[in-house]
C-alpha cells in the first residue's frame, strides 16, 4: 500500500519505511527457502502462497523504486525456490511446512488450497510475465530471465529470448526486426551468477556490471543475437532467521 501511495503521489519519503518493513520480514517472517511463516514467531504452522506472491511483488517493486539489486535478487530467489515449487501437479498452489526454526527440511502441509492460494498463485505467474521486461526511454531492462518474446510496436522492437535459466548455461536474445530507434539492453547479473561471457553475433562484448546489470548498446539490426553464458557455484550460506540461535548452521545453495 505504501509503495502504491508513493508511486501515485510522488512522496518518496515512504519508501524507506517499506524497506524497513521488508528487512523485518526477511529476518523473522521468511523461511530459509524464501517462503513465509504464516505468523510471526509461530514457526510450527505452514506457509501461504498468498503471502509468498505478495513478497515477490513487493521485492520487485522495491527494486523498481530504488534500483537496489538486492531486492531483485530477493525476488529471483522467491520465484525460483517458492512460486515455481509450491505450484502442484494440477497447476494449483498449496501450503508447505516452513523450513527453518522448527522444520529442517521441506514438506507439504496442504497439497492445494484451491479456494485461496491457487488464485494468488495465478496472479504471481501473471506478474512474473509482466515483470520480465522494463523500459526506461530507449533502454530495455531485463530483470529476470524467462523464455519470452517482447514486442514494442512504437519503436518496432521484436525481441525473442531463449533460456532454460537457472538450468543450462546460456541465455540468447534475438532481434527479429530492426528497431526504429537505437536501443540498449540491460541484462541482470545477480551476485550469485558467474558471468562467463557476453557476445554480440559471436563477438565478445565488454561486460561491465553496474548496479546488478551488464549493458549491451545498439544499434541493432534484424537477426542480431546477444548471448550470455553463465554458471553458478555451490556455496554454504548462514541461516537467516534471527530466532535461530545456533549460528553454526548453514544451508546449501546453488
Where are these regions (language model features)?
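Glycan-recognition and catalytic cores of secretory/periplasmic carbohydrate-active enzymes
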Residues: 1-254
Amino acid at each position: 500500500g505504501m509503495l502504491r501511495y508513493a508511486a501515485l503521489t510522488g512522496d518518496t519519503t515512504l519508501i524507506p519505511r517499506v524497506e524497513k518493513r521488508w528487512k523485518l520480514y526477511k529476518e523473522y517472517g521468511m523461511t530459509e527457502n524464501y517462503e513465509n511463516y504464516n505468523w510471526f514467531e509461530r514457526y510450527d504452522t505452514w506457509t501461504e502462497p498468498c503471502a509468498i506472491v505478495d513478497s515477490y511483488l513487493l521485492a520487485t517493486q522495491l527494486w523498481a523504486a530504488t534500483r537496489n539489486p538486492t531486492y531483485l535478487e530477493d525476488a529471483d530467489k522467491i520465484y525460483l525456490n517458492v512460486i515455481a515449487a509450491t505450484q502442484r501437479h494440477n497447476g494449483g498452489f498449496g501450503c508447505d511446512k516452513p523450513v527453518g526454526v522448527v522444520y529442517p527440511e521441506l514438506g507439504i502441509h496442504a497439497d492445494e488450497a484451491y479456494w485461496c492460494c491457487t488464485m494468488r498463485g495465478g496472479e504471481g505467474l501473471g506478474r512474473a510475465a509482466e515483470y520480465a521486461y522494463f523500459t526506461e526511454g530507449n533502454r530495455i531492462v531485463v530483470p529476470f530471465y524467462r523464455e519470452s518474446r517482447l514486442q514494442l510496436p512504437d519503436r518496432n522492437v521484436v525481441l525473442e529470448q531463449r533460456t532454460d535459466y537457472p538450468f543450462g548455461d546460456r541465455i540468447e536474445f534475438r532481434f527479429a526486426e530492426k528497431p526504429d530507434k537505437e536501443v540498449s539492453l540491460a541484462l541482470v547479473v545477480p551476485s550469485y551468477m558467474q558471468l562467463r561471457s557476453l557476445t554480440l553475433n559471436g563477438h565478445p562484448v565488454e561486460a561491465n556490471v553496474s548496479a546488478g546489470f551488464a549493458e549491451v548498446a545498439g544499434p541493432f539490426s534484424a537477426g542480431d543475437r546477444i548471448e550470455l553464458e553463465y554458471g553458478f557455484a555451490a556455496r554454504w550460506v548462514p541461516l537467516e532467521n534471527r530466532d535461530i540461535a545456533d549460528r553454526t548452521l548453514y544451508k546449501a545453495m546453488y
